[in-house]
Each structure stands twice: as structure tokens, then as C-alpha cells.
Amino acid sequence: MFNKQEFYTKEDLLNSSKGNLFGKKGPVLPAPNMLMIDRITKMTTNGGNYNKGFVSAELDIRSDMWFFSCHFINDPVMPGCLGLDAMWQLVGFYLGWIGGKGRGRALGVKEVKFTGQILPTAKTVTYLIHFRKIITRTLIMGMADGEVMCDNKIIYTAADLKVGLFTNISTF
């Protein structure tokens, strides 16, 4: 039985990647190295900009993270697509947290803006997810806006992130 909490540790998130958090039919997070979250600091079914659900999570930045050695040589920066993927990861996690079943798949994003970067000298990345709408019919789908902050400064914004849960991924 899933124990619903308002926050989750790295160990909890790793258990999710193994399918041990939401059960065999629930969504999973990716495993390291693609897991872009170290902890979830707050989850609510209300709150956020639209009062329809909110998630706050963090990633601790270390200069030895895998992407800094290849993106780019002599000009290391965290790929922006990893921050976007982290926001999709959190939308999918939230869908499992509210009881959704199935495998999570990113379905799109309307708009992404990058106004800063994550360098090896950064300390903490914070993700803020503001849910706009949750659909719980045949397809479970979350729609949200997101922000990525680096050391307390907003550096990415995403409008209309979409993630769906599929009980049969061959139909996706």
C-alpha cells in the first residue's frame, strides 16, 4: 500500500524508479543517470498558481555530474532538455501520487523559455510545478506550468507541460 506523503527523499525516488513506490501498475521515475531530482520538498492537491496542485523539488548540483564532461568540453553546462525532462518527471510522479495507474509518457509542452543556465559552480536547482488541470478518465493526464530555478533565480519556464499515464503502452 502506497504511503502518501508531502515530501520524498532520494531513497523514495530511487524506489519509484524500481517500481516499488506506487505498486506494479503505477508510474515510475527514471533511474540514475536520467533521474534529475534528489528530493521532493512539497506536494499538495491544491496550491500552486491555479490552486489545482503543486510540486516543489530539488537537485543538488555537483561539478562531476555526467553531463558536464560532454556538454560541452571546456564549456560545461547542464543541457536544458534535462531540466525540461525533470518537470515532466514530476508531473508523472504527481499523477501516481494522486492514485493514477499506468506508465508515464511526456505528451508535449506548449512553450519553453531559457533565460539562464546551470553551471558546475551552481549549488541547487529547484523545480516548481503548478497544475492547471488533471484528467482522470480512460487516459490519466496532467497539465501544468513549470519553473526551474538555479540558486533561487528563475532560469527556465515551461507552459502547458503534458504527461499521460498509459495502461497499454503499445497504444501510445
Curated annotation (Swiss-Prot):
Query: What cellular component terms from Gene Ontology apply here?
Result: cytoplasm
- For the keyword Cytoplasm, the answer is yes
Query: Which residue positions are annotated as catalytic?
Result: 71
Task: Relate the assembly described in the record.
Answer: Homodimer.
User: Is the keyword rRNA-binding in the record?
Assistant: no
Give the record's GO biological process terms. unsaturated fatty acid biosynthetic process
Protein name, per record: 3-hydroxydecanoyl-[acyl-carrier-protein] dehydratase
Which Gene3D superfamilies does the UniProt record give? Hotdog Thioesterase
Q: Which domain of life is it from?
A: Bacteria
GO molecular function, a single term: (3R)-hydroxyacyl-[acyl-carrier-protein] dehydratase activity
NCBIfam families, from UniProt?
Answer: fabA, PRK05174.1
Where are the bilayer-spanning segments? Answer: none
Q: What is its EC number?
A: 4.2.1.59, 5.3.3.14
Q: What is its main location?
A: cytoplasm
Quote the pathway field. Lipid metabolism; fatty acid biosynthesis
What family is reported? Belongs to the thioester dehydratase family. FabA subfamily.
Functional description taken from the UniProt entry:
Necessary for the introduction of cis unsaturation into fatty acids. Catalyzes the dehydration of (3R)-3-hydroxydecanoyl-ACP to E-(2)-decenoyl-ACP and then its isomerization to Z-(3)-decenoyl-ACP. Can catalyze the dehydratase reaction for beta-hydroxyacyl-ACPs with saturated chain lengths up to 16:0, being most active on intermediate chain length.
Sorted UniProt keywords: Cytoplasm, Fatty acid biosynthesis, Fatty acid metabolism, Isomerase, Lipid biosynthesis, Lipid metabolism, Lyase
Spell out the subcellular localization from the entry: Cytoplasm
Q: Which Pfam families match?
A: FabA (PF07977)
Gene that produces this protein: fabA
Q: List the catalytic activities from the record.
A: a (3R)-hydroxyacyl-[ACP] = a (2E)-enoyl-[ACP] + H2O; (3R)-hydroxydecanoyl-[ACP] = (2E)-decenoyl-[ACP] + H2O; (2E)-decenoyl-[ACP] = (3Z)-decenoyl-[ACP]
